[in-house]
């Protein structure tokens, strides 16, 4: 089959996968849709720590630009959560596909290289499973690809005497917006900006002035928007707040610490798989996109909190740097087959099944009056899906190493969602007992991978649990236990507990 046909088939598959309710990571909702739905739809729900005024570690400006128009339109047409999620994911999909296509034209030196890069960019599982999801990392990827592509133009045309004042102004806007979206954006643009300055801007001061002016104007606008959004009397500079927070290792420890080699040895293989073999002979020059990859990975590896999604910009930038026509050290045909097999497997795991039942269960629970929902051993539920204007959301707290429910208002017996995260069964028993004693209608939502532990609620604690709903399409990869085969059971269930 011709590569062009395979490419278009994969693009169609990626679009369909983008519409699946898979749930890759809580931040795809908590750092974007959750807070914006509260702003635009007037809902009540989870307010992540980053968006609490005492931290003010995330900017609202990029969210208004990338999600605001779609969500305002959804509000005007009174769209439900399925339409809202689908609209945002379709938007993310088309932005990525169109932008990477343009970037390939700017970066690719020959028609064959552009065609091969377009094939790789279209067949990575990242398109449907990550890039179409509402991550701040997805926005970072779009901005990084756009900025690197324009820097390539500036450097290439600069040799012919072009000044590119307007493009420099656009670059200033993109760089500022990228920093306010994620402070890690500086890492991806570090080396490319140094090269661009040395090869172009040190001789074109007018263009450099345009870049700096647009950077300052955009930064000022973002600061103004955030200051209004957080309602503080002092100016809010979210990238600075975020950087200061992440430079404190005690803060990072609350989110999980990893060895500094995690990005290189774990996260890159997870995102690129056999695609890393393309580096063996398939990269003949240190291109600007490749410099961005090196710069980004090196910078992010300095911090001990390392997740695969932090490296999303590396995927398109690396694939744009590959010249498959020069691949000699490994078989091209075999490598491409491994590439397609890897991405086919990962798109099913991450794009279709991963934590999918959480969103499915929320849609189901939305159809009836909400009493008390207790979520146990799942990802944090994105409560915006419930579209509830009177919701109370609470979770556990720690006193030393002891996990407790001190901050859970036990007197709220309606419109209450409790995220117990991965707490022990004793705390689950205590929580259920408190609400049942108060006469609450209690729903317990748990993955089937912990069904044996769920059964202890009846055997050990005497609860009467009745399964009200079950979906089999749910992969829980967080509680796998090789000594317990039942932990590999797919599915998620909603129980009524009395």
Curated annotation (Swiss-Prot):
Protein name from the UniProt record: GPI mannosyltransferase 4
Topology in membrane: Multi-pass membrane protein
Gene Ontology biological process terms, A to Z: GPI anchor biosynthetic process
Glycosylated sites: 429
Pathway membership, UniProt: Glycolipid biosynthesis; glycosylphosphatidylinositol-anchor biosynthesis
InterPro entries, alphabetized: GPI_mannosylTrfase
Transmembrane stretches, start-end: 4-24, 60-80, 118-134, 135-155, 169-189, 208-228, 261-281, 286-303, 332-352
Gene Ontology cellular component annotations, sorted alphabetically: endoplasmic reticulum membrane
Family label: Belongs to the glycosyltransferase 22 family. PIGZ subfamily.
Alphabetized PANTHER family for the sequence: GLYCOSYLTRANSFERASE, GPI MANNOSYLTRANSFERASE 4
């Amino acid at each position: 089959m011709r590569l062009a046909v395979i490419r278009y088939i994969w693009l169609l598959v990626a679009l369909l996968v983008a519409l699946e309710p898979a749930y890759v990571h809580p931040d795809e909702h908590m750092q974007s849709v959750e807070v914006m739905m509260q702003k635009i739809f007037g809902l009540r729900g989870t307010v992540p720590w980053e968006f609490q005024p005492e931290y003010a570690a995330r900017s609202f400006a990029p969210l208004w630009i990338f999600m605001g128009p779609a969500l305002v339109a959804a509000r005007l047409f009174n769209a439900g959560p399925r339409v809202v999620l689908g609209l945002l994911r379709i938007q993310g999909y088309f932005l990525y596909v169109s932008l990477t296509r343009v970037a390939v034209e700017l970066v690719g030196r020959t028609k064959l290289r552009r065609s091969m890069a377009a094939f790789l960019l279209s067949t990575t599982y990242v398109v449907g499973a990550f890039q179409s999801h509402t991550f701040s990392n997805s926005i970072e990827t779009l901005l990084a690809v756009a900025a690197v592509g324009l820097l390539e133009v500036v450097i290439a045309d600069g040799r012919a005497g072009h000044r590119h004042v307007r493009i420099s102004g656009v670059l200033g806007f993109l760089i500022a917006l990228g920093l306010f979206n994620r402070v890690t954006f500086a890492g991806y643009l570090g080396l490319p900006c140094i090269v661009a300055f040395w090869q172009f801007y040190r001789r074109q001061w007018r263009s450099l002035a345009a870049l700096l002016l647009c950077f300052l104007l955009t930064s000022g606008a973002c600061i103004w928007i955030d200051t209004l959004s957080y309602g503080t009397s002092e100016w809010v500079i979210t990238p600075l707040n975020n950087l200061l927070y992440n430079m404190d290792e005690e803060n990072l420890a609350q989110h999980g610490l990893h060895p500094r080699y995690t990005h290189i040895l774990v996260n890159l293989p997870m995102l690129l798989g056999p695609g890393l073999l393309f580096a063996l002979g398939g990269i003949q020059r240190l291109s600007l996109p490749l410099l961005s990859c090196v710069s980004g990975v090196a910078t992010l590896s300095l911090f001990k909190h390392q997740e695969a999604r932090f490296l999303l910009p590396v995927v398109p930038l690396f694939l744009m740097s590959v010249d498959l026509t020069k691949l000699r050290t490994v078989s091209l045909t075999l490598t491409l087959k491994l590439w397609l097999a890897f991405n086919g497997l990962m798109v099913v795991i991450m794009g279709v099944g991963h934590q999918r039942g959480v969103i499915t269960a929320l849609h189901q629970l939305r159809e009836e009056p909400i009493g008390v929902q207790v979520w146990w051993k799942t990802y944090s539920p994105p409560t915006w899906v419930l579209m509830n204007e009177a919701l109370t959301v609470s979770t556990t707290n720690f006193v030393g190493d002891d996990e407790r429910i001190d901050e859970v208002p036990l007197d709220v017996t309606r419109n209450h969602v409790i995220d117990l995260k991965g707490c022990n069964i004793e705390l689950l028993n205590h929580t259920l007992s408190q609400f049942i004693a108060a006469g609450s209608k209690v729903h317990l939502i748990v993955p089937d991978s912990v069904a044996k532990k769920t059964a202890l609620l009846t055997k050990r604690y005497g609860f009467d649990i009745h399964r009200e709903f079950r979906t089999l399409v749910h992969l829980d990869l967080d509680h796998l236990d090789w000594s317990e085969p039942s932990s590999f059971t797919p599915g998620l269930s909603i129980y009524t507990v009395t």
